[in-house]
Amino acid sequence: MASTQHTPTELEAAGDLVLPAADELAGRFPLTPNAHPATPEEYGEIMSTLAFGKKFTDHMAHMRWTREGGWSDRGVIPYGPLELTPGASVFHYCQSVFEGIKAYKREDGSVWTFRPGYNAARLNHSARRLALPELSREDFVASLVDYVRADVKWVPDVDGSSLYLRPFMFASEEFVGVHPAGVVDYYVIGSPSGPYFKGGLSGVAIWVEREYHRAGPGGTGSAKAGGNYAASLLPQIQAEAKGFSQVCFLDTYEGKYLEELGGMNMFVVMADGVIRTPELTGVILEGGTRNAILRMLRDEGVDVREEKIALSEVVDGIRSGSVAEVFACGTAAVVTPITRLAGDDFDVEIAVGDKTREIHKRLTDIQWGRAEDPYGWTYRLA
């Protein structure tokens, strides 16, 4: 039966709230120009290579929170090293959360982003879980607006490339002792970036991890916390040594149900047209790209199911043909076909499918302004 009823999640509802226009928010983070910006030669080299997340722009947005005074010291300042003592609590207790969002340059030279309200809501969700302070969505979006306007020349105009934005906050108070920090810093940095996976829609090979888990029930799995990603690095290294691009993690209880990749959500396209994705259990990240895909599919009348998906179902389905496509999604890679799925006792391959291509095209066309945005997801920054 096709999905007809859908109750928005808390993040989805918060992300759909109408934001003030960028011009109304501009100026909240006053600019202190960088006296030593990248030279023309350095700038040219960076913009001609566009490696993902390797180089950064001339400035960064910043504000600070204290228990006594709340958020203050807003500004766009020169990019450079941070002053932290070895006693800064983030080094000891991992109070740190982040977001990932992109700025796209359209053909007319304008710069847009995708669902910043959703990212603002998710940052606050993550902050609550790690006992960090929340910030207003206006401050969050204003930090993007003022930062991008200061460094707008760093937004690539190459198709498929973008200025990858990394808002993050961390506990910077100096102490050793297990309690929430009374001083927290928030920053936005940006990296001119090409595609996350160089192969594009050619597909990636995924190793299914049985020994290690990304997160567990009651933990921080639904938060975009740095520690979750640190926990994925060892199995990622081991998978890469076997020739795989990413790791798929299974549930901690039974070790049989798909959860997510190290940094992306998963979808399974059945041959009968049903599209499935692992349900939100508080363990996996509620991805903005995942949510957008679900909404588009539901509006098309597709039978979309958020449910437990056993690994054995997928492997057997690929072998029998009842599973037609498998793909992953996230801000960095958008939509990526999974063309090989392997583990200790199985190894199956599957072709890139038409539905994956269609979803990728529809989503990126909205993001880049090549198609109508019926949801109001795109937001002009500059």
Model-derived features: positions:
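Helix-start/capping segments and mature chain N-termini
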Residues: 2-143, 147, 175-382
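Charged, gly/pro-rich active-site loop segments
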Residues: 137-139, 147-160
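Intrinsically disordered, low-complexity linker/loop segments enriched in Gly/Pro
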Residues: 150, 170-172
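Extended, Lys/Arg-enriched charged tracts that mediate electrostatic binding to polyanionic substrates
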Residues: 56-59, 156-170
